[in-house]
Amino acid sequence: MANVDELLETFGNMTLLELSDFVKKFEEKFEVTAAAPVAVAAAGGAAAPAEAAEEQDEFDVILEGAGDKKIQVIKVVREIVSGLGLKEAKDLVEGAPKPILEKVAKDAADAAKAKLEEAGAKVSVK
């Protein structure tokens, strides 16, 4: 365990350029890569872009317009977006098209879209 602590201390004293050089040499010596596993998965999916689109797991909910029932839409926006005050929600609705939620799960995006559409808003999920 002392060796690991010594290595950490040494790495802590190195500059970013020295660390970058170390990583390159480490990758060459042990024939590995320091790339994140997500990047590896994305590289495999690049061969079939249609499949990559189907496997999307993060969605943005975009408010395209408030429609006729702006007050109802503002109430729903405040309900969906936590910590949003009345003025912020009003500005968000009046400034449409704007993202309401970003990088959320499909279930959450669909639920938010349904609530907003029920209130009279025009919404898209991307």
From Swiss-Prot:
Its keywords, alphabetically, are: Ribonucleoprotein, Ribosomal protein
Q: Which GO terms describe its molecular function?
A: mRNA binding; structural constituent of ribosome
Which CDD domains does the protein's record reference? Ribosomal_L7_L12 (cd00387)
Pfam hit, one: Ribosomal_L12
- What is the purpose of this protein? Forms part of the ribosomal stalk which helps the ribosome interact with GTP-bound translation factors. Is thus essential for accurate translation.
The Gene Ontology biological process annotation of the record reads: translation
Lineage summary: Bacteria, Bacillati, Actinomycetota, Actinomycetes, Mycobacteriales
Family matches, as SUPFAM superfamilies: ClpS-like, Ribosomal protein L7/12, oligomerisation (N-terminal) domain
Keyword Ribonucleoprotein listed? The answer is yes
Indicate what this protein is called per its UniProt record: Large ribosomal subunit protein bL12
Q: Which family does it belong to?
A: Belongs to the bacterial ribosomal protein bL12 family.
Question: What are the annotated disulfide bridges?
Answer: none
Q: Does the keyword Cell division apply?
A: no
**What is its quaternary makeup?**
Homodimer. Part of the ribosomal stalk of the 50S ribosomal subunit. Forms a multimeric L10(L12)X complex, where L10 forms an elongated spine to which 2 to 4 L12 dimers bind in a sequential fashion. Binds GTP-bound translation factors.
GO cellular component annotations of the record: cytosolic large ribosomal subunit
